[in-house]
Every structure is written in C-alpha cells, then in structure tokens.
C-alpha cells in the first residue's frame, strides 16, 4: 500500500508567491500593513524603496513572534521580502511541510527552496533570530529588460 506524502512541493511556493498577503512582483502600495521607510542604493537595481511593517501587522507566524518585516521594491513593485522571527525549530518544520525538503547551502549556511519565479532562503539572523528571505526572479528579469531598453535609448542618441 503506497503512502501519500503530506509534504508539499515548490509548486506551493509558486502558488503563495510571497509571505502572507505580500506577493512578489505586485504593487507595494496595495499593502496597508506596510509603510515607506527610505530609498537605498543597490548594486543590481541602483535604487530600491524600503518598506517596513506597521505596528499591529505581521505580528506572528502561528505562535512564532515576528520581530521585523522589510520589503524592497523596484519601481513600485515588490522585489524582496525579509522576515525576521524569534528562533524556533517549529518554523523550519512548517516550511518543510509547506514547501517540501529544502536544499542546504554550506556557503551561505542556510536552506533554500527555488522555483522559476522565486526563491526562499531560511537561516540564522544573529544568535537568537531566524530570517526568511523571499526573492522575485521575475523582478530580476524585468531589470534586465529595463537595462536593455536603457542601452537601446543610449545607442539611438548618438
């Protein structure tokens, strides 16, 4: 008799496309639980907008306390979501149940799940905290298109 696995696959990661109601590659202004903090310089994107969670929003993942949520946006769209939580082994078990077995990266000393559209890394953040980092590969693709257009504009301006 074959047993069915309760563990999901990375298809579930694609389906969720982000953290809670914050979805990657969507307009950042639609999330009332986020507020603008600042613009930062970025090696890849040149400039990114930083948004942080408002008080009373994104307080926990089940019983696990969330310390911080930071969202990076490129041209108003969500590129990356960073979630900092208290250290709790239940978080890793929950991620495995939701998205399947991760790959371990000894170089980054973290675990990751990856699809064609996004990646999720999980690891330590300081001694007593954990970090989830969702990154949109779709937004990286848009950046490449923007850079091609910029080069095209420059080449036509001679």
Show which residues each predicted segment covers.
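Bacterial Sec-dependent N-terminal signal peptides
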Residues: 1-8
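Mid-chain, structured segments of secreted extracytoplasmic proteins
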Residues: 50-91
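Non-cytosolic coordination micro-motifs
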Residues: 8-51, 80-158
């Amino acid at each position: 008799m074959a047993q069915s696995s309760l563990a999901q696959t990375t298809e579930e990661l694609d389906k969720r496309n982000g953290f809670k109601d914050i979805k990657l590659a969507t307009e950042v202004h639609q999330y009332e639980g986020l507020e603008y903090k600042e613009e930062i310089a970025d090696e890849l994107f040149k400039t990114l907008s930083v948004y942080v969670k408002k008080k009373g929003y994104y307080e926990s993942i089940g019983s696990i306390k969330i310390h911080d949520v930071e969202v990076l946006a490129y041209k108003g769209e969500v590129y990356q979501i960073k979630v900092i939580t208290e250290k709790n082994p239940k978080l890793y078990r929950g991620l495995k149940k939701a998205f399947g077995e991760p790959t371990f990266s000894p170089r980054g000393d973290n675990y990751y799940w990856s699809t064609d559209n996004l990646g999720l890394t999980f690891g330590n953040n300081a001694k007593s905290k954990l970090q989830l980092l969702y990154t949109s590969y779709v937004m990286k693709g848009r950046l490449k298109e923007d850079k091609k257009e910029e080069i095209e504009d420059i080449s036509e301006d001679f």
